Structures are given as structure tokens and as C-alpha cells.
Amino acid sequence: MTEADYADFLVVGGGTCGCVVAARLSEDPSATVMLLESGSGYRSALELPDVLGDPYRLPVGPASEYTWTYPVELTPRRASTIARGRTLGGSGAVNGAYFMRATRADFENWPSAWRYDDVLPYFKKSETDRDFESEFHGTAGPIPVERRAWDQLHPLSGEFHAAALGAGFPDDVDKNAPDSFGVGRVPLNVADHRRISTAIGYLMPALHRPNLRVESGVNVIRIVFSGTRAVGVDVLDDGNVRRIHADHVIVCSGAVATPHILLNSGVGPAEQLAEQGVSVILDRHGVGQNFVDHPEVLLPYHFSTPRAIRSQTPVLETALNLAELEIRPYTASFTDLVPGVPRMDHGVGVVLMAPRSRGSIELASGDPAGAPRIRYNYVASTHDRAANREGMQIAENLLESIAETGLIDRPVVEYTDEWVESRLGTSLHMSGSCVMGAESDPFAVVDDRCRVIGAQGLSIVDTSILPTIPTRGPHATAVMVAERASAILLGDE
């Protein structure tokens, strides 16, 4: 067996988590680490295309070379398309640089080994916070975190903050504090007007290590097993299938691709696998189930007078966070941010951050190269529909207050099911499709050490394992999970 087709640790997916895991594992010079990425790869930050470092543009449009796109069913009556990162750094390399952590309360329903006090050291290890120095913030981590200066805020962001305070909502000075609640500035993984993904912050500084190898442009089609032990993967490389062997396979392909890879490998609900002609290795009912995201309804607003697009303005500078809701005053239309999308209004996002509805990711065919069947089952629960309307009312009231300043016209909002569903979208915060839980839980896929239950030599490290979706965007939490999982894999925990 040659060096080219073997590694001690084989990391599948060079997205947000995969870049962290590969960089941290390769800190052990005695371990060989190989990272496989389906999209584009770069040897240094100097090679990075400008659009991947520009936090004011979102290269996720229909013609983007940096994303995978998937057809999805948001509701039985509303189809859509989602985009996932297809480059080193993954979706964190193409998003709006929102870097809020999960709150202390979010971890109360996680396994006991993953409570807030257990994970705080890894949040801190991941970051250099440029605005706060306290026991809750890191000062020497790979990801810089900063908030937009008050005097540089877009007018809408400033008026939104003032309107929310005027409505009686608390001033949320530090949104990465453990019990964050209220209105305040959004933490961003940005430094010097540059989006710092985990590819830039973690992976590229490690590429000089002789024990770390990165292959880009290769698609993993299945995990290879000997019995129930993972011994490698099959990849599609320039149209040819190639096998790479490993002592330990770590799947970091995200909440869509990870369950899809497992299902194609024979790990998942036995009945579903049999229907598609896939041989069953492990009957794990939870693979692809419990899929959850943050549903979002966009309420339109219009500036009272035409305004020039501000070229260096983050898409989201302030936000209102409540127990189960997030209200997002976007500073620009997504038409101006995302190349190739249809004309859209400026909007304020009303987002359910603790939805009860759950969806699924299943095999649509036995072809590993085919797209999975993705059903969101959005707003199926009565609770979600009521919470959504509560959020819409709050957002409408805030827009009315902003309109009184003359900045925007008065909003026009309808509350019919048809109007709401026509504006329903997703935050692209996919989670939960291979959840972490107790071995006795038939729907758990990994244990509290990120090991696939019933398998050997196989771990999952990405947002698919989150037991519950955070009430904040998952990016910062994903980095924390990858930091802690790396420590577990290295035997430091």
C-alpha cells in the first residue's frame, strides 16, 4: 500500500469542521492525516479567489462554482433549492460571516458531557475576540471575531437597534455571552474586511506539515467496511473510482452530505436501504432523520428614497434574539449580494430558532452520485405556525417604528397562510440528521465522543450530530464541536 492511498486519519469533507479537524489532528507529528474535499482547493490564502474572502458578497448563486445545489421540499406545496459550500472552508467560506455562539440554555438538552461549561474552553480556543476580554472570550484562536463599529453601521441597522430598544427589548451588548438575549451587534468572523473561514484560519497555516495531505476535486461515494469497521473510502476522481484506506474515517461533510454518504455506504434505516438496493452494514434508524433548519420568512421593506448600495457593509450587522425567534434587518437585497438570483425586495428576516417541525434526508435512488431526497416539513407544527406569526408581528411593529423616522416606507405585511408560505425560505443552518445521543436511543447515530454507534473506526464531526439545533446560527458552534472532537480523537479528553 502506498502513502498516496493510506492515512491514519482520513477526513471526509473540507468544510467548516473538516478544516479544523485536519489542522488539529496534524498537530501530532506521528499521525498521518488526509483531507478530502469535493470542491476547489488552495495551497495558501494568496491563491484564494477574492470572492471567497469578501464578506460583503455571497457567492452562492445558481451558477456558483463554490457550491453544491440541491432541490428540496420546504412544505408539500413549496419547492426550493438550497446551496452548500463546495470549497475548502465549506459553507463558512461563502456565507455572511455571522459568528454567534449557541447559548448556555441550548446545551441543556445535549448529552451531559456537552454542557456549556464543558464546551466553553473550545469556544474560547477557536477565537480571537477583538472587542471583548472576559472569561467567556478567547484571545489567541484562529478565527477573529469582531462587531461592526457603531459609527459605521448601515442606517437601517442603527434605526433597527433604536426601535427595538424603544419597544422595550434588552440591550444585548455581547451576543456571544452565555445568556445572550435582546438586540445588539452581530459577531462576525471578519478581519480587515476579509471573511476568515476555517480554511484560512486553521487549515492553510498547517499545510506545510509533512504529515498533512489535502486532495481537492474528489467526491467520496461510500465508506468501505470490513464487517462493521470502517477501513477507508471509495472516491470518484476524474471519472475513476479509487480506494483510500485509513485507520479512522472522520466524516465532516455537513448535515446534507454526511447522511447521504452513510446511506450510500449501508449505514441507515435497513428498510430504506433495501428499497434502493444498498447492502445493510448497520441498521441505524436515525441516519437522515431529525433533520432541522431555521425557517425564515422575509418581510419586505422599501427605502423612502433611493439609496446607493454600500459596497463594504455586512449583510447583517444587528439582530434581535428572543427565546425562540431571531429578527434580522438585512442591509441589502439578496439580489445585490448573490449573483444570478431573481429580483428580491429588501427584507427583514423573521426566523424560528427553535422549530418543532422535523424533516428528513433519504436516498432518492441507489446511485451514489444522485442527489438525496430532502424534505423540510417546515411549519408543520401548530407551535411553529404560532411562533412565526408572533415574530412577524414583532418585526412589523419595528418596521413601523423605523418608518416613522422617514428612512423606509410603511411595511405591507399579510398574515394569510398563502402570503407567508410564498415568502418562506430557509436560513441554510442544516442540523440534526445524524444526532448525538445515548447508545440506547434507536435514533442516535453517534455517541458523546462522536463515534458512530455500532461501528468501529468511524466518527462524524459536523452539524449533522447536533442533538438540538442552536437558537443561533450554527457556524461558531460547529467550530467548537470540531475543536472538541479533535481533542477527543487525539486522546486529550
From Swiss-Prot:
Binding, FAD: 8-37
Residues at the active site: H429 (proton acceptor)
Class of this enzyme: oxidoreductase
Protein name, as recorded: Uncharacterized GMC-type oxidoreductase in thcA 5'region
InterPro entries: FAD/NAD-bd_sf (IPR036188), GMC_oxidoreductase_bact (IPR023978), GMC_OxRdtase (IPR012132), GMC_OxRdtase_N (IPR000172), GMC_OxRtase_C (IPR007867)
Enzyme Commission no: 1.1.-.-
Keywords: FAD, Flavoprotein, Oxidoreductase
One Gene Ontology molecular-function label: flavin adenine dinucleotide binding
Homology family: Belongs to the GMC oxidoreductase family.
